[in-house]
Amino acid sequence: MAKAFSGKKPQHFGNTIRVFLNYLGRHKFMLGLVGVLTAVSALANLLGTYMIKPVVNGILETGSIPGLVRGVALTAAIYAVGALSTLGYTQTMVRAAQKVLHDIRRDLFAHLQTLPLSFFDSRRNGELMSLFTNDVDTISDALNNSFALLIQSFIQVVGTLVLLFVLNWRLSLLVVVGYAVMFWYIRFSTNRSRFFYARQQQALGDLEGYVEEMAAGQKVVKVFNHEQTNLEGFQALIARLQSAGTSAQGYSATMIPAVVSISYINYAVIAVLGGLMVMNGQSSLGSLASYLVFVRQSALPINQFTQQGNFLLAALAGAERIFNVLDEQPETDEGTVEIVRVEKSADGTLVPSAGGRRTGLWAWRDSADPAAPLVPLRGDVRFRDVSFGYIPGQTTLHDVTLYAKPGQKIAFVGSTGAGKTTITNLINRFYDITSGTITYDGIDVRKIRKSDLRRSLGVVLQDTHLFTGTVADNIRFGKLDATDEEIIAAAKIANAHSFIERLPQGYNTMVSGDGANLSQGQRQLLAIARAAVADPPVLILDEATSSIDTRTEALIEKGMDRLMEGRTVFVIAHRLSTVRNSNAIIVLEHGGIVERGSHDELLAQKGEYYQLYNGMFELA
């Protein structure tokens, strides 16, 4: 079962905030400009409100109409500056937010490319997709809507409090009490909401993973009539999402009404006491008018602070999930031996081929020694006492010793779970062995750069995966710098050229939906052509012909005979007919080798292979 991302109460919000601030810090100038413009906007609003005092007092004391006009004009100018500043920080924040989101998406995708296969084995595709959609979207909402408003609200709250004390320090003590009650309740609700926002993001990820999985497997679902079962599973997931969302939004929804209610009570009490102070001559009417407007307006930034804080909590929950993935350790590669395509120079020495041109020749050298010569790569692969387990403490392979000499075809047969595919995964170093040694031309594979090792191994995976693009693009995936001539040559080797020529646009025919517009056999032929264009010294066919009809299989076998010339080949197949001409057949059972020999030798032994061949055991 796929491992889910952590849905427990967040434990590292402090670290999440620090990493988030680091991303913001990459765009200091733009965010600094946002901060300045936000501060100007907030201060303009405060100053505009403060202007009520001199305007009202001026009218009462002098009755001067020109003075009134000047005061109103000055107030209007202050508010205009605030409006322009608001427009400026809004537009700047949009651009800054998109830059930050670009950085997060880029870093996340780039980091995923560096993670070991075991990371993807334990997680569903939909959960990973949710990181780029749901979680990034919550960050986007927070940056676009909340960042500047939080700054503005903070400045307005602090500025309002300062001006209130300037206008009337006695009444301001009551305001402080009201603020204290507000912030206590906000903190209480925030702490509760934070837990449920994290649960909500986790539920969204699980839901997207489930939908993606069911959409990909609809044919199987319908074959076995599991529509109702799937619906019940979906309803359980959306019930979890509903529960988490209701709790998160429920606590959040109480904050604004609570703040408004407290501010109204505060306002009423202060209005009564302020009126008494004016009647007793302890305050001017202008001061009270300005003071009451400040008190009334103070609820707005607090409400904004509360509301945007909710968006920020959701964003931090999403950011924590993203940053947890970014904290995953990348695939380690300490290899110094490089493998390169080579060609022979005029004097017969090996030199790297120009532009990686296909030459059929490969060589290796230790990059740690600049003077090291290029040594021809022959394709000799050996396992010595190799043990391995996908899960610590559980052994999948034990004490496996085998060899494949250059140019040999080695076939693996055995029942499901015997360890056939695991062996090919270890050759590729998709996983590292627990004990023992795997050598490639006498070099421990752990000393070879993984990228070079995999480049020298042509692989046809058990499940053919095609990408959106043309037929030529999918073949070129095996060698990104392959020329059109190399693409066609590879297709001919795989016997795919004839069917490609019959497609509507030939090699430019678009492939979409993982090759849904192609037959199983055609997809398999393209996968083999993809391996052929790589021109590798070692070829791995993981059940490459298991889903192909007899006629297509015959075409592939003819092409593969040409492709295998001079190469070391490992084959895993369902059909024993595909391994008859192997130099050696290795029979695996329960993670160990039980027999090795040629087809005739193994039949003569009348052991496991004999029983498989005669249909007494199921081959998988």
Give the residues covered by each predicted segment.
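Helix-loop-helix
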Residues: 61-66, 70, 163-177, 247-320, ...
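Short intracellular "coupling" helices and adjacent cytoplasmic loop segments at the cytosolic face
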Residues: 2-8, 98, 106-136, 209-233, ...
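ABC-type nucleotide-binding domain
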Residues: 342-620
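Juxtamembrane loop-to-helix connectors within ABC transporter transmembrane domains
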Residues: 16, 24, 56, 89, ...
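Transmembrane helix-loop-helix hairpins at lipid-water interfaces of multipass membrane proteins
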Residues: 31-88, 92, 165-170, 268, ...
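Hydrophobic alpha-helical transmembrane segments of ABC transporter permease domains
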Residues: 36, 44, 48, 73, ...
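An intracellular "coupling" helix at the cytosolic face of ABC transporter transmembrane type-1 domains
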Residues: 26, 117-118, 136-143, 147, ...
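Membrane-integrated ABC transporters
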Residues: 1-44, 60-74, 89-93, 97, ...
